[in-house]
C-alpha cells in the first residue's frame, strides 16, 4: 500500500533509531518533513548530518508553540510519551498522531504481520519466530523493538512474505489501524512504572496488539498467566494458549488450542504434533515457553511442521541470553549478561541442575538477593562478585555458597577457571546493571566472551 504522503507536512518527534527510520521512509515517499528532538547538533552527532542530507528541517530545544498543530501528520518515536501537552494539543487541533509502527504498518498492510509483546522473552520469541518462518522458505522481516525498525521493512514492501515484529507497550500506544495476522502476549509483570499509572494501564497498552484483529486472525497467549488471560477475553480472534502445566489458570477464556510442555519438548495438542527441544540456545523452562509461542505463530501462520522442527533445531540464539560461549576442559561458559535484575537470574538458574559458578554484580537495583540464594541451593557452588554491589551480594550469599570477591570481570573469569571442574558451568548472570564498569549489558557480555575465548 502506498500512502499519499507526497507534499504532506509531517513532523517526526524524536530522533532515536525508530524516528530516524521513519524520517527516511517519509522522505522516500516525498513528504515535507520536520524532525524535532530536544538534543542539539553535538548530541545528535551523525544523526543531525543525516537529517540535513535527507532534506528535512531539524528543530532542537523546546518545542515551538503551534509547531505540531501546523502539521498534516505527527509521527512519534516510541520513547516520546503521547501524553505530552504539545501532542495532546495537536490531536485536539485535528492532526493525526501515529507511532512509527503505525506508519510502517499502513504501508505494509498487504503482508502478513505477526506481532509479539509481553514483559519478558519478546526478543527471543521474535528472533525464534523469524527463524521458523525463514525455515519455511518465507522471505521474513524480523525487527521492530528488536534490531531493525519496522520502517525499514516499509522501504521495500515487495521484499517480504512475512513480518515478525517485536512490539513494546510504548510502540503499541501509537497504533491505530495495525492488524496483526497473529498476535502473541507472552506474559505480564510490573514494568515501566514511570510511564504507566497502574499495572492495569500497562496491560491495556499491551492488549492494543489485538484491538484491530478480526475472526480470521489469531491470538497466542500464556495460559499460565492470569493477567494475560484476562486481557485475552477481549480478543475478537480465536485464542490459542501455551502452558508449562497443561492446566490453564482458573476462569481462562475458551481456548481454540493448547501447546503443552512434555518430556524432551512440547506438543501442539490440537494438531497432534510433537516437537523436540534439544537446542542449547533454547534451554530452560522460559525458553520452552518462548518456543511454544513461536511454534504456534508459525504453524497457525502457515509454516509446515517439518520446517518448524528444523527451525527449532537450527536457531542460533540471541547474544547475552544464556549464550553458550564455549566448553573448555569439560566446563561450559555461559554469557547471560542480559540478566540485569534478580528475576532474570532466577530464570537462568532454573536452566541448570548443579555445578554452577555464578559471576554476579554490577550496579545494583535495590532488590533483595535472597531469592537468588534460595534458587541456587544445591546447584550454585560459588559466587564470584564484581562491581559496585559486590559487598551486598557477598553478605547475601554468606554461609550459602563459596564467595570470592573479584572486583572485575577479568579477575572473576580467571578465578572461575581455577575453581570450575569438569561438568561445571560458569554462568555470567549479574542481576545488576552494567553501568559501573561497562557501557551497557552488551559491552559487558562481549567483554566476557573475549576473556573466555582467550583462556
From Swiss-Prot:
Record carries keyword Nucleotide-binding: yes
GO molecular function, one term: ATP binding
Pfam families listed in its UniProt record: Mur_ligase_C, Mur_ligase_M, MurD-like_N
Transmembrane segments annotated in the record for this chain: none
Pathway: Cell wall biogenesis; peptidoglycan biosynthesis
Catalyses which reaction(s): UDP-N-acetyl-alpha-D-muramoyl-L-alanine + D-glutamate + ATP = UDP-N-acetyl-alpha-D-muramoyl-L-alanyl-D-glutamate + ADP + phosphate + H(+)
Keywords of this entry: ATP-binding, Cell cycle, Cell division, Cell shape, Cell wall biogenesis/degradation, Cytoplasm, Ligase, Nucleotide-binding, Peptidoglycan synthesis
One cellular-component annotation, GO: cytoplasm
Compartment(s): Cytoplasm
Ligase as UniProt keyword: yes
Superkingdom, taxonomy of origin: Bacteria
InterPro entries cross-referenced by the UniProt entry: Mur-like_cat_sf, Mur_ligase_C, Mur_ligase_C_dom_sf, Mur_ligase_cen, MurD
Role played: Cell wall formation. Catalyzes the addition of glutamate to the nucleotide precursor UDP-N-acetylmuramoyl-L-alanine (UMA).
Protein name as catalogued: UDP-N-acetylmuramoylalanine--D-glutamate ligase
Organism: Myxococcus xanthus (strain DK1622)
Lineage start: Bacteria, Pseudomonadati, Myxococcota, Myxococcia, Myxococcales
